[in-house]
Amino acid sequence: MTHDLAASGLRFGIEEEFFLLDASDLDIVRSAPAGFVAACRDTLGEHFAEEMFECQVEVASPVFSTLAEAARFHGQARQRLAHLAMDFGLRSLCVGTHPFADWRRARSNPAAHFARLFEDQGRVARRSLVCGLHVHVEIPPSHDRMAVLQRVLPWLPLLLALSASSPFRGGRRSGLASYRRALCGEWPRMNIPPALPDEDAYRRHLALLREAGCIREDGQVWWMIRPSSHVPTLELRICDACPRLADALSLAGLFRALVGEALGAGPRTLPVARDACLEENYWQALRYGCAGRYLVGGRAVGAGDWLEMAWRQCRPQARQGNEWAYEHARGLLGETSASRQLRRYQTLRAAGQERHVALRRLVEELLEENLQPALAGPAGKRAHEGGRSFRPAAGAPMSIRGQE
């Protein structure tokens, strides 16, 4: 593979999850009104999907070649979903956790796929009222996806820190920048992937899990990064859903650059200390976000230094087309969604607002952020159309969305 293909030529896709709220009190709804799902399917087509709770939906993109394309599609999709929701007395909210919703009010989706999840995972699934951001980056067939995964993996806590948007749970401060990822840790096969060296080892591992009855299908391996089971991509799953679309686009661009660098790099041995440092860095990101101290190269560094190290490691070809993503991420170092939510809540409480009033105002501000226009790339182009579909080896078109 040439460095050009390993860089700006990498196609990608983005999946965003949303809560559905009652427009009157801004709490989650138990069920969407009759006709809402059908209206969403009519408007968003194959890019719309229901989720494991009836108060959640997902928008899965077509395939993009540039961040400007992604800005166009997702900017329009957020607007369309918001308008449809308002037509049905709802609001759509993209954030890691709803600041004051009670997970016990959420009604599980009765569809067979989701019913099996709740049967298998019990209360762990019931408690998982969270929204995430997933990014797919296409891996050329000449490269082994597990080998690329292992090269990218050590950087993932940095992406979590930048995306953190779930500091509240059930109306209380959780003490974590990403409470969503703490909940993910209750699930099997949802945290750090094992050190499998290549896709052959990965397939053998999946076969063992199926034979043992641990999983019903390959898609039930939910690691924070995984080879997709239905399209030729690596899927980033660690990030919280981003209230601001620009943040989501920045994370997609950074991940794409890191994958491009991994594709262009020669084979190397992973450090023995990887697991220990990765686990600690993951905790630092989950707990402190961009205020964490990260173990990199045998020393502790801040998120800003780590981001600069990540960008500096990427070859010019891997950076190409993703420069805006890095510049935007530098701005997130000063205030992520999680730290902004906490700051605003503290300001409102200090001004004498009751807790429930401050939390409602917080949701109102998050809803406003959801519809802020995103500027992707130096030209700041906005979009109204998407790209193509990934294709498997046989050549049949595929959607990036698959079973969770």
From Swiss-Prot:
Superkingdom is: Bacteria
**Keywords, comma-separated and alphabetical:** ATP-binding, Ligase, Nucleotide-binding
Give the enzyme's EC designation.
6.3.2.2
- Which stretches of sequence are listed as region Disordered? 377-404
Gene3D superfamilies (alphabetical): 3.30.590.20
Which enzyme type, at the first EC level?
Answer: ligase
Some GO term, biological process aspect, for this entry: which one? Answer: modified amino acid biosynthetic process
The catalysed reaction is:
L-cysteine + L-glutamate + ATP = gamma-L-glutamyl-L-cysteine + ADP + phosphate + H(+)
Which Gene Ontology molecular-function terms are recorded? ATP binding; glutamate-cysteine ligase activity
Which Pfam families does the UniProt entry name for this protein? GCS2
State the protein's purpose: ATP-dependent carboxylate-amine ligase which exhibits weak glutamate--cysteine ligase activity.
Q: Which family does it belong to?
A: Belongs to the glutamate--cysteine ligase type 2 family. YbdK subfamily.
Q: Which NCBIfam families match?
A: gshA_cyan_rel, PRK13515.1
Q: What's the protein here called?
A: Putative glutamate--cysteine ligase 2
